[in-house]
């Protein structure tokens, strides 16, 4: 079995993107999306990914937002975060400096999926 270096995004650390790189191509985005464990979707012509999270109560949604914020600071890669309808959070990821998706976005998506609010 051949080892795929992209299989475990959550074990990786985001690396600073200085710009000047090309964004991931559509086929690579599709491949990377398959490696995530949940329902992340590409949009805006495969230049961004997003996912909506739903929680039982507002407090859980707010806790989740705060944990995503801590993760973003630790990784140096910051998603757009929208808390709406009291218990739903939309996370949108892309790398602003290259105007599209980078491996860092998938690393963040994988790590965000591991955040579980307390009951």
Give, region by region, the residue ranges found by the protein language model:
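Long, contiguous binding/interaction regions
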Residues: 2-119
């Amino acid at each position: 079995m051949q080892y795929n270096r992209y299989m475990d995004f959550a074990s990786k650390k985001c690396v600073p993107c200085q710009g000047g790189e090309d964004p991931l191509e559509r086929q690579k985005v599709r491949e990377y999306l398959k490696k995530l464990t949940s329902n992340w979707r590409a949009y805006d012509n495969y230049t961004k990914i997003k996912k909506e999270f739903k929680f039982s109560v507002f407090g859980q949604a707010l806790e989740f937002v705060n944990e995503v914020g801590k993760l973003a600071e630790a990784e140096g890669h910051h998603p757009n975060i929208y808390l709406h309808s009291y218990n739903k959070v939309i996370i949108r990821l892309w790398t602003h400096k290259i105007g599209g998706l980078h491996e860092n976005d998938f690393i963040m998506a994988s790590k965000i999926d591991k955040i579980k609010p307390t009951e």
